[in-house]
């Protein structure tokens, strides 16, 4: 091969690499975790090697642990040698007020807290509320700056030394339980937040204003545009691209407590230059709630109908409903038989004909698309006949095949003792913070997370799906398994001893390490 041809080939390869990188929502973020949804903005990332097993209770696979001064339930941003997360502002000798948020910058190698900043709030959230609180939105980073959020009404931009660049405050919608599940999205120089229209905006609704995607200039905090269609504050929108490369965000409407935004359903909102905030398509329905992470891929978007225990698949190009799939009929259910100490298969069963009849209510915000499968946890509540109990579920987007695998609720790990799995029994978690103060005022926050709470969104790394419950238990599922059986359960990990741990967090992954957190501490996990 001639020298000239070598040069041409190298230029082509570099051009292709640049084109691939330019498709990332955050430039240069392919090896980082710049936002809650990861470098692709989809909560999924490829990886050749990922830590699968750890135990904070035993100190196994733990590179560092850092005590946090107060509770928090947002995700973790990682860029280079910096880790960013938030907690509520601690109050001396008492539980936090749930209004102000502290942004923390940690050293990624040691876990040392390097600096902190305070973000003020205009509303008040319930501390350690098992739906959400002021810390629910995760930080965002781009290698030069980090943006911390307070769901009670502020966002601040800082450089990596902690110097404030700008601060924006706004008035969140109120009058209902807090339940704000929005996760910020960074796309190029545009930072997406969820806010109502400004008070002087002629399009703003009256006494009960709607929420919208609001685009901010990441450099100044100035509003660039507000999306055409509204969204509920319960919803977690997701970034993606259409087959032609058009960048867009899938957002939803419809939730509890009479949220006003209409119509119930989905909107795909464009981020393309010159069409920012415009609606590509809208799917309207009078059923169910948009209380999920709104995953979609190059072919399909998905919607759970919790009233009918059904899964709906939409054409991502048009928003047209393609098919409705039952989550209760002709399903394969692998449940654990404690007498035999192993799983048993019930194949092709109708859950509505069990004793008692079962309904399937996919756990809200605990869902993720991986390939052609939509994975989720199943809410479990005997009095409401919800199940299958303590199961990971998945439904195939094309065939409608549905599988359920029961997993242990918890695990007891003591030094020198074998692991003890706890099956099919409700458990309790602890909402005592690192300073020994009980911070939860709602007793429901002390459950196991398998019923009526908003767990952290699952993350897929290298084809493995990581689910974390309120107990701090993290299940690792082989997302490429041909069959969802006990072999697909790769690990049951912990963030601390059972009954003494609490987490509503998603994990992050960068440079071969997993970053996670509980109420009491942040941890870095991986091989030493």
State each model region's role.
Residues 1-3:
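N-terminal secretory signal peptides that target proteins for export/translocation
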Residues 20-528:
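Noncatalytic, solvent-exposed loop/strand surfaces
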Residues 5-16:
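Bacterial N-terminal signal peptides
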């Amino acid at each position: 091969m001639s020298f000239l041809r070598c040069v041409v080939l190298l230029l082509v390869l570099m051009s292709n690499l640049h084109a691939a990188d330019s498709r990332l929502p955050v430039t240069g973020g392919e090896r980082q975790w710049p936002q809650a949804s990861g470098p692709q903005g989809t909560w999924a990332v490829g990886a050749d090697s990922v830590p699968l097993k750890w135990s904070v209770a035993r100190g196994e696979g733990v590179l560092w642990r850092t005590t946090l001064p107060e509770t928090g339930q947002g995700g973790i941003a990682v860029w280079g040698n910096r880790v960013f997360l938030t907690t509520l502002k601690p109050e001396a000798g008492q539980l936090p007020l749930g209004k102000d948020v502290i942004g923390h910058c940690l050293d990624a190698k040691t876990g040392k807290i390097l600096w902190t900043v305070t973000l003020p709030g205009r509303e008040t959230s319930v501390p350690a509320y098992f739906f959400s609180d002021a810390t629910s939105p995760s930080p965002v980073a781009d290698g030069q700056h980090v943006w911390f959020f307070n769901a009670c009404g502020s966002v601040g931009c800082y450089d990596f030394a902690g110097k404030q660049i700008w601060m924006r405050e706004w008035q969140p919608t109120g009058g209902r339980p807090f339940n704000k599940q929005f996760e910020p999205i960074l796309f190029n120089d545009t930072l997406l937040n969820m806010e109502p229209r400004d008070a002087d905006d002629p399009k703003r609704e009256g006494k009960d204003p709607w929420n919208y995607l609001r685009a901010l200039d990441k450099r100044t905090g100035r509003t660039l545009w507000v999306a055409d269609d509204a969204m509920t504050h319960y919803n977690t929108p997701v970034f993606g691209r259409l087959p032609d490369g058009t960048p867009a965000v899938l957002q939803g409407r419809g939730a509890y407590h009479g949220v006003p935004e209409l119509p119930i359903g989905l909107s795909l909102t464009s981020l393309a230059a010159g069409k920012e905030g415009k609606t590509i398509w809208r799917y309207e329905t009078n059923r169910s709630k948009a209380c999920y992470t709104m995953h979609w891929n190059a072919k399909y978007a998905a919607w759970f109908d919790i009233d009918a225990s059904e899964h709906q698949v939409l054409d991502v190009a048009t928003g047209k409903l393609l098919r409705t799939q039952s989550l209760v009929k002709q399903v394969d259910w692998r449940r654990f038989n404690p007498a035999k100490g192993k799983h048993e298969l019930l194949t092709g069963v109708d859950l509505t004909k069990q004793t008692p009849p079962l309904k399937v209510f996919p756990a809200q915000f605990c869902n993720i698309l991986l390939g052609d499968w939509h994975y989720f946890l199943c809410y479990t509540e005997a009095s409401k006949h919800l199940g299958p109990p303590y199961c990971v579920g998945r439904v195939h987007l094309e065939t409608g095949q549905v599988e359920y695998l029961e997993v242990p609720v918890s695990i007891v790990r003591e030094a020198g003792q074998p692991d003890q799995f706890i099956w099919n029994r409700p458990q309790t978690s602890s909402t005592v913070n690192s300073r020994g103060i009980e911070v939860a005022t709602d007793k429901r926050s002390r459950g196991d997370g398998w019923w009526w709470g908003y767990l952290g969104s699952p993350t897929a790394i290298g084809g493995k799906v990581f689910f974390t419950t309120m107990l701090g238990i993290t299940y690792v599922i082989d997302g490429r398994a041909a069959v969802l059986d006990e072999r697909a359960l790769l690990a049951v990990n912990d963030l601390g001893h059972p009954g003494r741990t609490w987490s509503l967090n998603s994990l992050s992954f960068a440079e071969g390490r997993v970053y996670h957190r509980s109420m009491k501490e942040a941890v870095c996990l991986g091989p030493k």
